Amino acid sequence: MAEHLAEKGVTPYGYDVINEAITDGNGNKVRGVDNVFGMSGDTEPTENEADGLELNWESGHFYWGYYVKDYGVKAFQLARKYLPAETKLFINDYNLETSPSKLAALIEWVKSIDAANGSAIVDGIGTQMHIAINPTDDATSNTSIVSNLKEKVDAQFKTLAATGKLVRVTELDVDMCKYNANGEREAISSPSAAQYKCQADVYKMVFESYKTNVPEAQQSGITIWSLTDNPDEHEYWLKDGKPNLFDADNLRKWAYKGACDGIAGEDLGLKFGGEDYKAYYERQNVSPTVQ
């Protein structure tokens, strides 16, 4: 990959060296280390004279950790060796805003990688932030959803900022859904105006929290995961959902304005316009300006 980038004359800003290495169960341990063998469907590798080595791991899981127990530091050392000096090296994971124990485990592993290297080699930590909410048509209930989520998001960003590392939101989206008795996701496929408003408020809150709790020098940026609500973009991820800033027709949603307000630090109000935006919300009998 480094050779390919060099051939194209590309110097990437950042590189995700290790992705999703911390388990959700097993006490939030590092996959491939201390007998934590991958994820669901994986079992301990076996070896015998007749069959040789059988990893017993599903494709794409952390089989290489079986061979190299200190793969964390080696991965970063190789990335630092072959990538441009300007490229920032990141580690990335999910559910960090909802699981303080997983966040703590990731940070401890980052510390151990830096220590094993003899100096800081991890430049930044990425938090995916695939947020799921179940908004209603009740404004008070939706306000509580945003408020409760804000406490978790604030705490996450404060904890990440305390590491002194760069902090990046890597895969932000806000899914409107509920979960049935079997724990299966059910998308809110036709959200009401109030539900769209709640989604916008969550987007706004995330941007505001990031700017408030992460010092500017540590702000690496926020990446939105996918662009529109077009079903073609959600064939596999958040199927039937409406998680993005633009609708299926590429028109701006309230979520777009929520993100813009969060970036601007103010309600842009009528300064934010465009006939496509207004027409979309007039069809829903919703004011184009969030009151």
Regions found by a protein language model. Give the residues of each.
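Loop/turn elements at helix/coil->beta-strand transitions in domains of secreted/extracellular proteins
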Residues: 7-14, 83-89, 118-124, 161-168, ...
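Aromatic-rich peripheral "rim/lid" segments of glycoside hydrolase catalytic domains that contact
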Residues: 4-7, 16, 20-65, 78, ...
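Glycan-recognition surfaces
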Residues: 123, 129, 223-226
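Glycine-rich anion/phosphate-binding loops
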Residues: 1
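Histidine- and/or cysteine-centered catalytic micro-motif in compact active-site loops
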Residues: 94-95, 128-132, 172-175
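Aromatic-lined carbohydrate-recognition surfaces of secreted/lumenal glycan-active proteins
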Residues: 12-19, 62-103, 168-172, 221-227
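Distinct, well-ordered alpha-helical segments
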Residues: 26-30, 75, 99-116, 146
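Active-site glycine- and acidic-residue-rich loops that bind
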Residues: 67-70, 97-108, 131-153
